[in-house]
């Protein structure tokens, strides 16, 4: 936001110097980026009129001008500006004037004497325009000091605003903060109604609901099309970074800069029928003021007459209804639009305007009626005309309502760590335009409509801290006892999980928590998804329901770049929609791994082989061993897994994850031409650590017995081993599966499982009779429970 220092001081009388004002603005959160002094060395620059201009006899691009500078005689000035002409009023630097580093002297240019210099705005340091002489109004008093005529000296101040301070996109909004910081008051502002003279109106229809709940319009007829922007108004615009265009456009820009309310002026004679605020129809076209023809979708707000859109609401007017140098009848517009309805629409069209910048951050919903009265008064004063009544259409139920906030003394002290006197609290908040009612605990505060960023008690306390001064808050060290957090023995921390996986030659990767909906469809993961309201892009619009889609995609990108052995893992949050409508999504921490390529790094002593299910299961079991988790595996029916090489993972009877080979069809769809083995499971159940319980080491020898059973194909090793453990009890030290065989000698529908039982007692040496009894019991149970038979 750029503005004139003198303009600001006209709204808030303060004694601070320019440097003090800049320091104050920065201290209260309105960071000053640049201060450009204007007109401080124009003591010998006057208003002058060119009486005669003749071509220089020795130079085609120079003119010899006779100039009236109010000194009783004409001065001869040699000038090279393309717009130098008889009758032009422009600044003249007299001999002895200092313009920047240049001192003006009498000189000869190509043999012709020149007694001064006609100046451009850039040469005077007033503007960046160097196209020609600074053209002043024809009625500017010849001979008057230019600084006096232009209201100089002044300064152009540019501040950097945070997104929450949209109220400071106006001179008056800034004035309230300055008044509070400098113990001053903002000058009262007269926005009284202008009485209508005619009855001419345009009906207004609001058809966009909450997106456009307030719209004010006024017809003014009989405007003088030859009226020019007065120098005081043009200079305020120029010093605020806005180039004057024409009177009507300049008035709307002036109101926007002074009050913060964007406005638009239509040529009334180009409008047909009532004005409507509505959503655009897909495919509608509109020629904009910048000359572009745009095709709209149904997400834009438009201002339309009876037959067509005539403006993009909150962004830019239409070319066909613009005001021109012949406009005599005008329709002024001032409206409030919901920021969400404007946000992002300009970027769709590659369009950035001052109006859009303000509307998408928020504009005071109470301003439109005031702004249209101020603009009307300026039009009548500068261009004449006959005003009609203001048409004020609104949907009160959709207008923002100010909240009453309880501000407690104790809360101020607790948040800021200092006590602020009640008198100072009241003074600062009232200077900011807030209404206060004293209560026992403090005050009930209602913020003005322009401060829509004030919603909770802490917002008010932040304002007090800004205005009171952060530099006045004493520096204190935090107190309290320092405690060393002891790691829980019942919990395996994430760092340990990472170290375990790294020790298994896995490398950690971190992927986006957002995924492409199309990718999830390929994985057939479409239930319970959490979509983003404002995604970074269409490809990152869903919060990930699990880690594997992103992890496998990363593995695929690496495999496609000649990485022969890829071993990745990731720890991260996953998200699921809540079962109850309106409840917050659920999130949980998962761990996943995905590998492909060779099982081992290339070495001369081992034959190369590809990684398989059992390799990755070994990685998972090593991780489980770190927490003492006893995992069980059951065949899985997940659609993204290979039907014969995947399993669901259970702990204590609860499914906590999945392990297996990614389905070949899915891998092909992802452009991965190698087998991918992966697992993913919930981290919470996995890291619940079983505390070690030290037992007595047996002094007696262990005994091993090997058994082989023919069991039906559908019977899993997990079920068989569970039966063995239950049957043998405390004598069993370990049961190991050391062979699985299908083929010759084994009937179809069966498989051979060979296991080793390791038995040991702590109190005695087991005899053959003891061991034989155990083996007999094991054989009987397995044959009975699993329809198995001992293999001979």
UniProtKB/Swiss-Prot annotation:
GO terms for biological process: phenylalanyl-tRNA aminoacylation. It holds the Pfam family B5. Residues 39-147 form the tRNA-binding domain. Its EC number is 6.1.1.20. It is found in: Cytoplasm. It catalyses: tRNA(Phe) + L-phenylalanine + ATP = L-phenylalanyl-tRNA(Phe) + AMP + diphosphate + H(+). The keyword Protein biosynthesis applies. Its main location: cytoplasm. Mg(2+) binds at residues 453, 459, 462-463. Keywords: Aminoacyl-tRNA synthetase, ATP-binding, Cytoplasm, Ligase, Magnesium, Metal-binding, Nucleotide-binding, Protein biosynthesis, RNA-binding, tRNA-binding. Disulfide bonds: none annotated. One of its GO terms (molecular function) is ATP binding. The keyword Protein biosynthesis applies. It is an enzyme of class 6 (ligase). Transmembrane segments: none annotated. Its cofactor is Mg(2+). Binds 2 magnesium ions per tetramer. HAMAP family: Phe_tRNA_synth_beta1 (MF_00283). Belongs to the phenylalanyl-tRNA synthetase beta subunit family. Type 1 subfamily. Tetramer of two alpha and two beta subunits. NCBIfam families: pheT_bact (TIGR00472), YtpR (NF045760). This is Phenylalanine--tRNA ligase beta subunit. The lineage of its organism: Bacteria, Pseudomonadati, Pseudomonadota, Gammaproteobacteria, Lysobacterales. The gene is pheT.
């Amino acid at each position: 936001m750029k503005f004139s220092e003198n303009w600001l001081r006209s709204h808030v009388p303060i004694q601070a110097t320019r440097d003090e004002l800049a320091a104050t603005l920065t201290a209260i959160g309105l960071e000053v980026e640049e201060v450009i002094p204007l007109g401080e060395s124009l003591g010998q620059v006057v208003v002058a009129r060119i009486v005669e201009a003749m071509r220089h006899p020795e130079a085609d691009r120079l003119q010899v001008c006779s100039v009236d500078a109010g000194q009783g005689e004409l001065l001869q000035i040699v000038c090279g500006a393309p717009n130098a002409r008889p009758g032009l009023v422009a600044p003249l630097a007299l001999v002895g004037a200092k313009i920047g580093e240049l001192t003006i002297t009498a000189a000869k240019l190509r043999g012709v004497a020149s007694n001064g210099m006609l100046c451009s705005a850039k040469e005077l340091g007033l503007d960046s325009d160097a196209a020609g002489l600074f053209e002043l109004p024809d009625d500017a008093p010849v001979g008057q000091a230019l600084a006096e005529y232009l209201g100089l000296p002044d300064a152009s101040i540019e501040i950097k605003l945070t997104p929450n301070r949209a109220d400071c996109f106006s001179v008056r909004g800034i004035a309230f903060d300055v008044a509070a910081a400098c113990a001053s008051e903002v000058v009262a502002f007269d926005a009284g109604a202008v009485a209508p003279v005619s009855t001419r109106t345009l009906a207004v229809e609001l058809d966009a609901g909450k997106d456009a709940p307030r719209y004010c319009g006024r017809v003014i007829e009989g405007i003088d099309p030859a009226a020019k922007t007065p120098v005081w108004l043009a200079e305020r615009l120029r010093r605020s970074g806005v180039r004057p265009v024409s009177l009507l456009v300049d008035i709307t820009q002036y109101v926007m800069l002074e009050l913060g309310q964007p406005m638009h002026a239509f040529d009334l004679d180009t409008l047909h029928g009532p004005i409507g605020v509505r959503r655009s129809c897909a495919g509608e076209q509109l020629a904009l003021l910048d000359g572009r023809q745009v095709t709209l979708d149904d997400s834009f707000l438009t201002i339309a007459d009876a037959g067509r859109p005539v403006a993009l609401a909150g962004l830019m007017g239409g070319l066909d209804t613009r005001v021109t140098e012949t406009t005599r009848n005008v329709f002024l517009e001032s409206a409030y639009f919901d920021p969400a309805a404007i946000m992002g629409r300009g970027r769709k069209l590659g369009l950035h305007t001052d109006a859009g910048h303000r509307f998408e951050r928020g504009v005071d919903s109470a301003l439109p009626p005031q702004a249209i009265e101020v603009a009307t008064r300026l039009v009548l004063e500068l261009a004449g005309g006959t005003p009609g009544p203001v048409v004020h259409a609104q949907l009160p139920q959709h207008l923002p309502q100010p909240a009453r906030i309880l501000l407690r003394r104790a809360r101020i002290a607790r948040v800021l760590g200092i006590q602020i006197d009640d008198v100072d609290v009241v003074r600062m908040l009232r200077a900011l335009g807030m209404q206060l009612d004293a209560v026992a605990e403090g005050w009930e505060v209602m913020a003005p409509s322009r401060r829509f960023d004030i919603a909770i008690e802490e917002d008010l306390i932040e304002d007090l801290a800004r205005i009171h001064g952060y530099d006045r808050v004493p520096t204190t060290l935090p107190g309290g006892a320092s405690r060393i957090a002891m790691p829980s023995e019942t919990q395996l921390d994430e760092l340990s999980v990472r170290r375990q996986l790294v020790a298994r030659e896995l490398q950690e990767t971190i992927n986006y928590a957002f995924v492409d909906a199309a990718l999830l469809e390929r994985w057939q993961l479409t239930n319970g998804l959490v979509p983003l309201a404002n995604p970074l892009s269409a490809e990152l619009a869903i919060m990930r329901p699990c880690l594997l889609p992103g992890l496998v995609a990363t593995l695929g990108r690496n495999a496609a770049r000649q990485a022969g052995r890829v071993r990745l893992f990731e720890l991260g949050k996953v998200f699921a929609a809540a079962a109850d409508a309106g409840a917050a999504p659920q999130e949980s921490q998962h761990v996943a791994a995905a590998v492909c390529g060779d099982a081992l790094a290339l070495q001369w002593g081992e034959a190369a082989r590809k990684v398989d299910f059992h390799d990755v299961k070994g990685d998972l079991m090593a991780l489980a061993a770190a927490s003492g988790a006893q995992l069980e595996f059951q065949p899985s029916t997940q659609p993204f897994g290979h039907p014969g090489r995947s399993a669901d993972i259970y702990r204590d009877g609860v499914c906590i994850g999945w392990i297996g080979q990614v389905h070949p069809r899915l891998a092909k769809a992802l452009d991965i031409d190698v087998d991918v083995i992966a697992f993913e499971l919930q981290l919470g159940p996995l890291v619940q650590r079983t505390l070690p319980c030290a037992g007595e080491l047996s002094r007696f020898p262990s005994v091993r017995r090997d058994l082989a059973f023919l069991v039906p194909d559908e019977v899993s090793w997990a079920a068989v081993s569970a039966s063995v453990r239950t049957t043998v009890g405390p004598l069993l030290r370990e049961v190991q599966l050391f062979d699985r065989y299908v083929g010759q000698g084994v009937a179809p529908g069966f498989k051979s499982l060979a296991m080793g039982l390791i038995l040991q007692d702590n109190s005695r040496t087991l005899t053959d009779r003891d061991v034989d009894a155990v083996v007999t019991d094991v054989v009987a149970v397995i044959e009975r429970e699993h329809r198995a038979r001992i293999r001979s």
